[in-house]
A protein has these predicted regions:
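Radical SAM/AdoMet-radical enzyme domain recognition
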Residues: 12-35, 44-169
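Canonical Radical SAM [4Fe-4S] cluster-binding loop centered on the CxxxCxxC motif
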Residues: 1-12
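Flexible mid-to-C-terminal extensions adjoining Fe-S/redox cofactors in radical SAM and related proteins
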Residues: 252-338
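Cysteine-centered iron-sulfur cluster-binding motifs in ferredoxin-type domains/subunits
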Residues: 40-43, 233, 286, 292-294
Length: 338
């Protein structure tokens, strides 16, 4: 795909080398994860299958264990592909933004004609049925165009999906669909509306999981993971079709954030270290925040796009995170009282 650069496909040679890089870079760690992301990975399906096969071979030789996830826009899904995903992928992320008019406004066909919603919904419903009790979720994005995103969550649940994530858009501030401070009051009220919907559906036997409301109060990640969140730049890297390494997919194509290649390994170790050191205890704004061990300092890319630095938290994101946590705590308190 053309995510962050020109439209191109990753070669099998590059994909295999990415597996080799992961084996070497993970050192003593046994468990490794590979996420097929795009662009659209189904456009390069043979390479996806061959990469899985190659990693399985290397498991036997190295003692590593690979876990695979794939994120797809669904247009290229067939029964054969669904069966392969269900047999080989730990998780599958099905991209859809909710109601037909919302989805089709942002997710268009290459020709610009027809409805992507009409193409993907029957396929997603079949995938949900075939998936059984294996992990999956439908994943949407809300923008300035659909601040009433609780209605999109309700719609996705009405379609039969019970594992749902709808995320705020991450984009440059100048985009017409970007979120801004003027949208905040509506967004916060909408999360409260969503919490009420969550409880009402659960009480009626139509419950669903919403990603941001799944907060583990008693167990959860260790302190190390809570400090730095996603691990972008040092535990998690994105590989471009050409084999270049970036801290995450949001930085792909930005040369100043290139940290190496799958052939040469990590070259810009200083940048990688900067991401590692950019945790909640090193950010002045975060130190006194009650939510710091749940949000882990927010999204580095969002911070960069809006606050000007990946080390400076974006206040709009902070406010949304706190509201999501408040809603999650409210839901858990209601569950405890019931």
């Amino acid at each position: 795909g053309h995510f962050g650069g020109r439209r191109e496909l990753m070669s099998l040679e590059t994909a295999r080398q990415a597996v080799e890089f992961l084996i070497a870079a993970s050192k003593h760690r046994r468990h490794c994860e590979i996420d097929f992301f795009g662009g659209e990975p189904l456009l390069n399906w043979e390479v996806v299958k061959e990469t899985v096969a190659y990693a399985r071979e290397r498991e036997k030789e190295t003692g590593k264990e690979f876990r695979f996830t794939i994120t797809t826009n669904g247009i290229g899904l067939t029964r054969e592909i669904m069966d392969f995903i269900n047999d080989n992928m730990y998780n599958v992320v099905l991209s859809i933004d909710g109601r037909k008019e919302v989805n089709d406004r942002m997710r268009r066909t290459v020709s610009g004609k027809g409805s992507t919603y009409d193409l993907i919904v029957p396929k997603y419903q079949e995938m949900r049925r075939l998936r059984g009790d294996k992990s999956y979720y439908v994943r949407g994005t809300f923008t300035a165009y659909n601040l009433d995103f609780a209605a999109d969550v309700a719609h996705l649940n009405d379609l039969g999906f019970d594992q749902i994530s709808v995320e705020p858009v991450v984009t440059q501030a100048g985009e017409p669909y970007a979120l801004s401070e003027e949208h905040l009051s509506k967004i916060l009220a909408e999360y409260e509306q969503l919490a009420q919907l969550y409880l009402e559906r659960r009480e009626r036997g139509r419950g669903f999981n919403f990603f941001h409301f799944n907060v583990e109060l008693k167990k959860g990640p260790c302190l190390y993971k809570r400090l730095s969140g996603c691990g972008a730049g040092f535990e998690y890297l994105a590989v471009s079709p050409a084999g270049d390494l970036y801290p995450c997919h949001q930085f792909v194509g930005q040369d100043e954030f290139k940290v190496g290649t799958v052939w040469d390994g990590l070259i810009n170790s200083q940048l990688s270290a900067s991401f590692k050191e950019s945790h909640v205890l090193s950010k002045q704004v975060c130190r006194g925040c009650w939510a710091k061990y749940y949000c882990s300092g927010g999204c580095h890319a969002n911070n960069l796009f809006h606050a000007g630095s990946f080390t400076e938290p974006y206040q709009l994101t902070c406010a949304m995170e706190k509201k999501r946590l408040e809603c999650a705590f409210f839901i858990q308190a209601r569950a405890a009282s019931d």
